[in-house]
Amino acid sequence: MPIQLTTPISESTIRSLKVGEAVEITGTLFTGRDAVHKFLHEGGKLPPEVKFRDGIIYHCGPVVIKDEQGQWKVVAAGPTTSAREEPYQGHIIKEFGLRGVIGKGGMGERTLNACKEAGCVYLHAIGGAAQVLAECVKSVRGVYLMDEFGAPEAIWEFAVERFPVVVTMDSHGRSLHKEVFDASATELARHV
């Protein structure tokens, strides 16, 4: 049974999570990709409506359309590869008080250290399931920095229900990505 989390999330709740646990998120997710991470790392200011503290950033460039009433509709919301954000993510976790980062593929040592220090987790979303994940997005509450970065790189504020993820990097210093890589390297060395 997945652990149910509702944003905003306390540090103590995040520190109770362990690698391998399935989680479903209800509440608010903010998207952020390469342009946003670089912008923030270089001292750019968030719009006042964007509340990262005790929240979650999602490495996602959603596909969105406007319906007949002029409301945004998310048709695809799959994760993008998180490794590109490694130069920035640790700083952003600490600077903005993030409690979670959603993406795919995991992240490196700097991000893992920031998760330990600040009380944050990396949550792996299912790659290739963009339409299924979009069904968890109940509405778009806002879009920010669209003029600066364009639709895929803008910050989208999603209201989500039961958004499914797995903890693959926790606040205790464990990284499932590193553990699998190390085990694979050991096994490969046995056969080479």
What is each PLM-predicted segment?
Residues 10, 30, 63-65, 172-174:
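Short, glycine-/Ser/Thr-/acidic-enriched flexible segments
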Residues 1-9:
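Short, structured beta-strand/loop micro-motifs enriched in basic residues and often containing a Trp
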Residues 11, 22, 28-32:
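Short, charged beta-turn/beta-strand-edge "cap" motif at the junction between a beta-strand
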Residues 12-15, 50:
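Residue "hotspots" at secondary-structure boundaries inside conserved domains
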Residues 89-90, 167-192:
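Active-site/ligand-binding-proximal alpha/beta "capping" segment
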Residues 31-163:
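Feature captures the catalytic cores and cofactor-binding loops of soluble hydro-lyases/lyases
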Residues 4, 24, 57, 166-168:
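Structured core elements
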